[in-house]
Amino acid sequence: MKPLVERINIAEIDEDLLTYDLNVVRCYKLIGNDVFLKSVDQGEEFFRDIHAFLNGLDDSLICTFVFKRINQNEPIVSRARQYLSKDKTIETLLFDDSNRAIEKGSMATDIYLFVQKSKKRKKTFFNDMAFAGLFEKEPEALALEREVLDQFDVKLSAMPQVKFQKMSKDQIYSYCYQSLNLEAPQKTNEQLFFKEYSLRDQLIKKSVNHHETYVQVGDHFVGSLSMEWLPVNAKGQLMHDLYYKNPNAQTAILTIEKASPEVVDELQSKKSLYQTFNLSDDADNTDTISNSSRTNDLQMAQEALNEGSEKLFISSFKVLCYSDQREDLKSVMSFTKNLLNTIDYAQFISDDFCHLDNFMSQLPGHPVHSIEQWVLSSHLAMFCPLYQPYQGTPEHPQFLFKNHWNELIPLSIRYGEADLNANHSMVVAPTGSGKSFFINHLIKTMRMTAPDDYVTVIDKGNSYKKICKVLKGDYYDIDFKPEYAMSPFPTKSDIFEGKNINKDQLIYIRQLVTLLIQDVNLKELSNAQERLIEKGILALYESVDSDTIPIITTFIECFSKVEATDEDDQKFIKTAIKNLGIYSDPDSPFSVLLNQPKQIELNNRFVVFEIGNLAKYPKLRNIYFFIIYNLVSLRMSDKERQQDIIYDEVEDILTDPTCASVVRRQYLGARKFGNRICCISQNIEHFTKEGLEDIPSNADIKYILKLKPESISCLPDIGFNENEISYIESSLQARRDIFIKYGDHAVVAKLEPSDLEKELYSTDFETFQKYEDLYSANDIENPLEIIQNNIPKKTPPKEVVTKGFSL
């Protein structure tokens, strides 16, 4: 017997009769559908009539009624079950709109009643108020089918209380499109590869009426390949081969849906597993090695689900190919299919995903030809390179991939799992592991998926100069220059609530003054000394108006007047004022930066602070870190926008106890403002020191790149289990893999940058020399074009490569 896919025929629509796969379909629209549901008695009589009607039909005829329950009329549904269940050949099922409410243990308002009389139930989509009749047996002649359907019309018209009307060709089209989920990508600035490409009624009609297996969009022809089986070991090679060896295979669509508990139970109980993956009616048609591989995959899935280390998903993978010529399209699809079928026994077939299968799958009682696979979460993540957009909704997630000449597309990093307490994150990325490419990509993702939110980066390695230029951000390369002068003291209007100072701001300024006055002879301060500093701060702000930016000189004047009767306190004040002199003396270079009535205005929503130039002055670097931290904290109170704060190369910051306490406090308190904190370090040890436990415990998202051997032993300290550690140690590849742990889940993503991404994200010495003019220029109209022109020329680039950065 031939495989199922070879038996699929092109649909023919003739007036109100539709034939498909040797079946004849006639569709009806229910008229006056609110009449019989107005009362329990009318509903009871109607279902009794249906019961009698179905029992009088030919056994080969499949009848499907789909009704929408109105006003939560529970007695009607109960009576329907009572009467329809008397005949064992009739099955009654209740579904909600999305066919998922039962899985969640709740019921939606809109519920459908599905009644089917047949020997074999078929998977079905449900829509409002419609009727369809199908034959399962192969007809001897079309005339016979018409005759039987005409007799059916007579019986149907004799039913009391309710009327059915034959659905015309246009009505059938409209009905079938009610459930198609063909929305464009959401919350991204990218467009599909054809501006006019949308699977709407007119495209489908044109393709079906002309018996074509592709969609014609303008001057282009689009065909589709579907994966019959998703191999576990395909990983990123599938994407790589698809896009780099065959650029004419322009787009691939991966739809993902979390498997229901029933599907998981079926997999764990080992029922019908082989049959699910055996895609032909004749087992001999399937390659023996492939069968063995599938069996191993299933056993692996069962073990992972039993351990609870994986989640099960249902996925469907399509590849769309396009060409200007019809014959060329056939060649492209043939070449692509042969290429993909060589990857770990992957099996692709040419299908009609673009029109026919999607259309016909909407008919009640008809089998769904969209091929779905069971796949574990980690294997699914290996399938996805990082340049991808999110499409759809949390209930219907989709990923749409583009090839390496298309615009850069973001990766969704805001995981929708309900068990995440906060979206704070941490990254462990040793030198040479691919950190610069990954973090640059995350930053671009943040800006493109939420352009109205704030993104603030504090760095010490000049890793983000180019991305800041391209995304029109503000870049502050802090040095001993007047333009980077920042007073440690905020304006009074920013930190006072009425007549009282904000308590958090008072603590911040006190900690900063403590940092300014500390030296080898003045390390630990007593509570009394800290209180003296707070009195000096309050006196400072009493002496200035609301819009004045206080400076260190003014603070010294106010601090010297603080009453201190104790001799030790008087000595402390004198020592503190003496230590502040290095910042207030006009001849000191530090006064140029810290003793000026200036503040950096953070008007741009994307800001990068580079403090690497202050590496020779660790105390000054920490002071600037404090000031920048407070500027960023003041933006937290903006209730209309969220904020991503990234601390890169934090090992020096976390070494200083005062600075480390600031980062720790942000991880604990930023969530209530809708802020997300991300710390990046080369070593796990920087996150496991005493007093820093709150960082890994509150970072619900952890990104691990290829680690050095000595760091593996620290993974349990930040919440990794034995299975995860084993994979990170043995299987994670440098400059390619990113192990992502979010909540109790873990996946592996592939770092596969395009040529433009490589040029944009690179941070080596040659790159800095190449783009020196770009860095020094204040305003460049199109910096991305300059970067694109420096890409090593392999093949002529397409114009679309720059579109992804339109904010």
PLM regions: where:
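Extended, folded cores of ATP/NTP-driven motor/assembly subunits in large transport
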Residues: M1-P385
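P-loop NTPase motor domains
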Residues: N33, V40-D59, P261-E262, Y345, ...
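Hydrophobic anchor at the beta1->P-loop junction of P-loop NTPases
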Residues: V427
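Walker A (P-loop) phosphate-binding loop of P-loop NTPases
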Residues: G432
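Conserved lysine of the Walker
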Residues: K435
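Hydrophobic positions on the alpha1 helix immediately C-terminal to the Walker A/P-loop
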Residues: F438
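Post-Walker A helix-loop "phosphate-sensing" segment adjacent to the P-loop in P-loop NTPases
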Residues: T445-T456, L471
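A short helix-turn-beta junction within AAA+ P-loop NTPase domains corresponding to the substrate/partner-engaging
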Residues: D474-Y476, L692-I704
